[in-house]
Amino acid sequence: MTWTHVLWDHSPGGNVEHVEEHDLTTDDVDYVLENYEATGVSSSSGRPCVFGHTLDGRYIVVIYEATDADTAVPVTAYEVSEP
């Protein structure tokens, strides 16, 4: 899957703030959405997710919602152990 659009909510409580709470940036998440290494489904929410390395080498999961075939809305992202 290739996302043409990634929607970020910069308002208080939005997905930008939530990602930053996990010491990640929107650039980290965008990079992994474009260069993921594995896909899956979140066991807690049932949402789709992708796994991959950030440019600085951290292995993260990005949980997102697909609003259409071209658009992803990141819900959360955080560092995880490599498989």
PLM-predicted stretches and their roles:
Residues 1-83:
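Ribonuclease/tRNase effector modules and their secretory precursors
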